[in-house]
């Protein structure tokens, strides 16, 4: 069997100047001086040439390739502009394909969607035409082209719904998709039939034929749904002969399906049913022949479809089978037999539309990133900002984890003084002439000595005195505020508010050390410290290293080497963690998903969130590696602690009495308290200067405001006194009519006018400097110079704005308030700062 495909025609268009349109768009958006930075003249010219080639007289395959490439550029541009494509101010002019009475109609629109849909229509037509050419060589090679064309027209029928062009209307593109699907199924069926031994595959041919007939029935229903008379020449879309073609093929393949079903029933011994189906097949062939006669004048399908030969085969089979049934089988022939129970078999796998145009869209990405780099939708910037925030949160979590791990590492190394401890232990066990004192006690002594030195050398070791100093400064500030005039009430309220916040910060700071005041005083008194410590050691005899046998000495030295290796591993973990963190930051800084966001600009918010999660996956391995180093560090520190305890136990070879064990326990408890006190004092010593500097600067600002108000009142008073002696009388005779001198009315203080310049020399507070902060007062004709703001950075702002500040952060940085701009923000003082 042979067949022919319905010939589809291309849409025609008018020339378009992309270079001019892009240049005009960029000039309107970026101005005459900057637009050229975003314009690529060479690539714009290539786009113009590509459109010309896509609508030229090239061969089918070359023309199809040019149209697919051009569509990739259009899709890239549409992803950037979307519904705003009218801003290009282009007139897209297209003509309907020359099909029937409506062919050649001209349409003009300003939207890029019209250009896209028209180009896609031509792509579908070119695929169908290419299938028609390949049909001559092989039905099998033509099927994939028809399947791709079906994907294009199905996409158009679902996407472009309101086009003015008849070719692009959803019902018409849907009809073309159904027609091409039926033709692809037909080619698959004919390929099976022509493959030989059709009788053995009668069941398969029945299902394939019936499915093909059903597809053509859908095309027939398209013409019936429009209400067109079958005898009329006009059709809703396409050429008039198309209606007869789809009707003929529908009945033809219904007949083929009935014929093959009859063969199956005959083999099963159901002769009566077989005769009924053969009668139905003969009737279908007769109806198909009627529609073919309507095509006689068009010379269409005259040679391709041998309908007479197929009809003769069916009629001959009906004649012989009916005769056998009449003379031999006498089986009942049903009058209302049907093929509705036949299972459908769609042999055509229509590809996804993205699979058809996706490769060309991807191929155009790099060129379009240069050509359209000045056209980026605002939604992409917004989503890129959201993605950046996601990256920032991920990076912040990893940074916090690394900083916490580094802090734990440094604290452990500092408080154990591990390198020196290991050297001392190794020297003691290698040199038997060295001190035989308990290694644990020696370690405690050295650690206590370092803490005591740190406390004694600190300027803030008197906790009570520091509290009194702060209280005295606060009282001085309040005293100055009490004499500030009412006109500065707003500034006074803000300064008092800052004092309140500072007092809350002070409470947090001092609460860290108040539980350990006695211990800190003890560290500040060496005599008392060692007297207390020695009470836990005098009753304990020191172990003699000579009492250690060689096996235990070797075991201790082996433990020391083991701990030293663990310490090296600990340092390597820290270095590795730092390196991983650096690589992660570099990757985060280099990461750019603008291209992906443009390609997915039409996706929903939920789909974009899914895209974000997929993109963030590339950072997960770094987090896993950091987590692994933190986990290994914790285990390594535990192993070191266990190893040190083992060494201390091995060194103390003598069995301890209960009193000695109690003394050792009390010594450890005493050491633990002092360790906590030293930790708390270290935080206190670090943060207290910030608070003292804060109060000092606040006091200076308050004093300036107080002195300025006093100066203004004094100036106004002097001015009133000077004017009181003035007399506008020109002779002594007028005095009797003016017994009282005319004085000027008192003037209210004016904060908006500068005081007299001559008063400058009386004000100089440059020598009032505390904790290295120099506050130079300018002339009174200028507003007071405020202290420089303390930069807080991004992390500072995040901590300030976060209402859920963790308790751990509050403990580690109780004076975070002093790092905020607070009262040093000029905008806080409406009158004083003006």
UniProtKB/Swiss-Prot annotation:
Subcellular location: Cytoplasm; Endosome
Compositional bias ranges of the Polar residues kind: 812-822
Described purpose of this protein according to its UniProt entry: Involved in concentration and sorting of cargo proteins of the multivesicular body (MVB) for incorporation into intralumenal vesicles.
PANTHER family: PCD6 INTERACTING PROTEIN-RELATED, TYROSINE-PROTEIN PHOSPHATASE NON-RECEPTOR TYPE 23
Name of the protein: Vacuolar protein-sorting protein BRO1
Compositionally skewed regions (Pro residues) per UniProt: 742-757
Any one of the GO BP annotations: protein transport to vacuole involved in ubiquitin-dependent protein catabolic process via the multivesicular body sorting pathway
Predominant localisation class: cytoplasm
Domain of life: Eukaryota
InterPro entries: ALIX_V_dom, BRO1_dom, BRO1_sf
Keyword Protein transport: yes
BRO1 domain sequence ranges: 4-409
Similarity remark: Belongs to the BRO1 family.
Keywords: Coiled coil, Cytoplasm, Endosome, Protein transport, Transport
Ranges where the record places region Disordered: 730-761, 774-822
Listed GO CC annotations: endosome
Coiled-coil segments on the chain, per record: 551-590
Any matching Pfam family: BRO1
Keyword set includes Cell division: no
Annotated organism of origin: Eremothecium gossypii (strain ATCC 10895 / CBS 109.51 / FGSC 9923 / NRRL Y-1056) (Yeast)
């Amino acid at each position: 069997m042979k067949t022919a495909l319905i010939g589809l025609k291309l849409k025609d268009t008018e020339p378009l100047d992309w270079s001019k349109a892009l240049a005009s768009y960029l000039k309107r958006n970026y101005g005459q001086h900057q637009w050229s930075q975003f314009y690529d003249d060479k690539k714009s010219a290539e786009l113009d040439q590509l459109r010309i080639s896509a609508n030229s007289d090239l061969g089918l395959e070359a023309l199809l390739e040019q149209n697919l490439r051009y569509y990739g550029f259009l899709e890239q541009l549409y992803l950037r502009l979307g519904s705003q494509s009218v801003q290009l101010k282009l007139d897209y002019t297209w003509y309907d394909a020359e099909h029937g009475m409506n062919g050649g109609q001209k349409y003009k629109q300003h939207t890029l969607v019209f250009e896209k849909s028209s180009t896609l229509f031509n792509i579908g037509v070119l695929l169908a035409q290419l299938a028609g050419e390949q049909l001559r060589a092989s039905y099998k090679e033509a099927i994939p082209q028809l399947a791709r064309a079906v994907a294009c027209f199905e996409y158009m029928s679902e996407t472009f719904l309101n086009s003015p062009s008849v070719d692009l209307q959803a019902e018409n593109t849907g009809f073309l998709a159904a027609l091409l699907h039926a033709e692809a199924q037909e080619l698959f069926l004919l390929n099976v039939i022509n493959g030989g031994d059709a009788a053995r595959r009668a069941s398969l041919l029945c299902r394939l034929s019936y499915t093909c007939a059903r597809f053509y029935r859908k095309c027939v229903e398209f013409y019936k749904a429009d209400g067109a008379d079958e005898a009329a020449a006009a059709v809703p879309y396409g050429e008039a002969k198309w209606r007869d073609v789809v009707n003929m093929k529908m009945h033809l393949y219904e007949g083929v399906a009935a014929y093959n079903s009859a063969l199956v029933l005959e083999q099963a011994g159901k002769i009566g049913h077989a005769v009924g189906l053969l009668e139905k097949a003969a009737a279908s062939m007769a109806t198909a022949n009627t529609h073919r006669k309507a095509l006689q004048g068009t010379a269409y399908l005259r040679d391709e479809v041998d309908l007479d030969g197929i009809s003769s085969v069916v009629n001959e089979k009906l004649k012989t089978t009916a005769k056998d049934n009449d003379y031999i089988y006498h089986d009942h022939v049903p009058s209302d037999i049907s093929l509705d129970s036949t299972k459908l078999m769609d042999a055509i796998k229509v590809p996804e539309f993205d699979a058809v145009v996706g490769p060309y869209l991807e191929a155009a990405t790099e060129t379009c990133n240069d050509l359209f780099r000045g056209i980026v939708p605002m939604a992409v910037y917004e989503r890129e900002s959201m993605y950046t925030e996601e990256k920032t949160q991920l990076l912040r979590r990893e940074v916090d984890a690394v900083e916490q791990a580094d802090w734990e590492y440094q604290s452990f190394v500092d408080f154990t003084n591990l390198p020196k401890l290991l050297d001392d232990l190794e020297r003691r066990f290698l040199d038997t002439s060295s001190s035989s004192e308990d290694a644990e006690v020696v370690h405690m002594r050295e650690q206590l000595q370092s803490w005591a030195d740190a406390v004694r050398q600190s300027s803030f070791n008197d906790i009570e005195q520091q509290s009194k100093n702060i209280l005295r400064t606060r009282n001085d500030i309040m005293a100055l505020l009490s004499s500030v005039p009412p006109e500065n009430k707003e500034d006074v309220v803000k300064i008092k508010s800052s004092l309140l916040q500072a007092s809350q910060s002070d409470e947090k700071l001092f609460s860290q050390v108040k539980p350990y005041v006695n211990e800190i005083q003890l560290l500040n008194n060496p005599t008392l410290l060692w007297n207390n410590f020695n009470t836990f050691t005098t009753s304990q005899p020191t172990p003699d290293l000579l009492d250690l046998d060689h096996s235990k000495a070797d075991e201790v030295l082996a433990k020391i080497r083991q701990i030293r290796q663990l310490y090296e591993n600990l340092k390597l973990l820290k270095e590795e963690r730092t390196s991983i963190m650096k690589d992660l930051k570099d990757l985060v800084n280099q990461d750019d998903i603008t291209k992906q966001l443009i390609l997915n600009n039409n996706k929903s918010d939920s789909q974009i969130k899914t895209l974000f999660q997929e993109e963030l996956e590339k950072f997960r391995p770094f987090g896993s590696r950091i987590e692994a180093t933190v986990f290994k560090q914790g285990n390594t520190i535990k192993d070191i602690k266990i190893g040190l305890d083992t060494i201390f136990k091995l060194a103390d070879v003598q069995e301890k009495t209960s009193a000695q064990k109690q003394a050792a326990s009390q010594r450890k408890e005493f050491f633990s308290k002092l360790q906590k006190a030293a930790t708390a004092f270290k935080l206190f010593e670090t943060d207290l200067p910030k608070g003292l500097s804060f109060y000092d600067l606040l006091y200076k600002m308050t004093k300036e405001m107080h002195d300025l108000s006093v100066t203004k009142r004094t100036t106004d008073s002097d001015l009133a006194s000077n004017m009181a002696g003035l007399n506008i009388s020109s002779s002594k005779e007028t005095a009797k009519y003016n017994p009282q001198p005319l004085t000027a009315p008192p003037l209210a203080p004016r904060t908006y006018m500068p005081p007299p310049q001559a008063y400058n020399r009386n004000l100089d507070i440059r020598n009032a400097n505390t904790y290295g902060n120099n506050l130079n007062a300018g002339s009174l004709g200028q507003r007071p110079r405020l202290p420089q703001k303390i930069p807080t950075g991004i992390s500072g702002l995040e901590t300030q704005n976060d209402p859920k500040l963790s308790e751990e952060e509050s403990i580690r940085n109780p004076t975070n308030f002093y790092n905020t701009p607070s009262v040093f923000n000029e905008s806080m003082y409406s009158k004083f700062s003006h």
